[in-house]
Design a protein with these regions (language model features):
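Active-site SXXK
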Residues: 23, 32-56, 69, 207
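Extracytoplasmic/secreted envelope proteins and their assembly/folding machinery
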Residues: 2-3, 44, 48, 63-67, ...
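Soluble periplasmic/extracytoplasmic beta-strand elements of cell-envelope proteins
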Residues: 14-19, 42, 80, 206-208
Length: 236
């Protein structure tokens, strides 16, 4: 059913779903895409890793940057936290730290290479484009759900940030009312993504949808219907 839906849509689509109770996986058209703001979920994980290592203090400033980056998708908060991943507070050093973390944890399709805009600070990059995939996003969310991303207490903090998400018009809007969901969106004029942990009536699951359609807004109702289809299939 999902394959048929994706085939009928314009552009490139990836969908990754994992039932967190029985381990069943649906992984359709996995490919690297420009992640837009979904990269922020990985910046969050690396930041907590730096806190756990004692390289960064979990203070009010850092907490506020994490909250802004995740719950309202603030670009400047993300750019700052990338700097905070380095002792020198250099953006490119911070990005290198994040990429070392990603490769150590097996996020092979994800890389952080430049700042996000619009933002107060000016553009910084190492010449490559940011990349990720629906599958890498799904693996990250599963680890957060299981309490194995950085540590159980930091996984809980990450889950709480995602649960406070304000950008709810993609995966969450396809779900029955009252269903708890922790998500992070990403969008530009050409890509539309959402990554979510859904706490369903019968089972909890991860769902990540990446789309590159080239036309702004085209994907939103389609992500919503993918979300509803998956929910009904796993929770009927």
């Amino acid at each position: 059913k999902l394959s048929q839906m994706l085939n009928s849509y314009g552009g490139s689509w990836s969908v990754y779903v994992k039932d967190l109770k029985n381990g069943g996986v649906i992984n359709l058209n996995d490919q690297q895409m420009y992640p837009a703001s979904t990269i922020k979920a990985f910046v969050m994980a690396s930041t907590f890793d730096q806190i756990k290592r004692g390289n960064l203090s979990y203070n009010a400033t850092v907490k506020s940057l994490l909250t802004d980056m995740i719950t309202v998708s603030d670009n400047e908060a993300c750019n700052q936290l990338i700097r905070y991943n380095s002792k020198s507070r250099s953006f490119l050093d911070g990005a290198r730290t994040i990429n070392r973390y990603l490769s150590a944890k097996g996020y092979t399709e994800t890389g952080c290479h430049h700042s996000l805009h619009p933002a107060a600070s000016s553009y910084v990059g190492d010449g490559s484009s940011n990349v990720s995939s629906a599958k890498d996003c799904g693996v990250l969310l599963e680890r957060i759900y299981n309490g194995t991303c950085v540590s159980s207490s930091y996984s809980r903090a990450m889950l709480n940030l995602l649960l406070r998400q304000t950008r709810r018009w993609k995966i969450p809007s396809g779900l029955p009312s009252g269903v708890k969901v922790a998500n992070k969106t990403g969008e530009t004029s050409s890509v539309d993504h959402d990554m979510a942990i859904v706490f369903g009536k019968k089972t909890d699951y991860v769902i990540c949808v990446f789309s590159r359609t080239g036309s702004e807004g085209y994907a939103i109702p389609r992500i919503k219907s993918i979300s509803g289809t998956v929910y009904n299939y796993l929770n009927k």
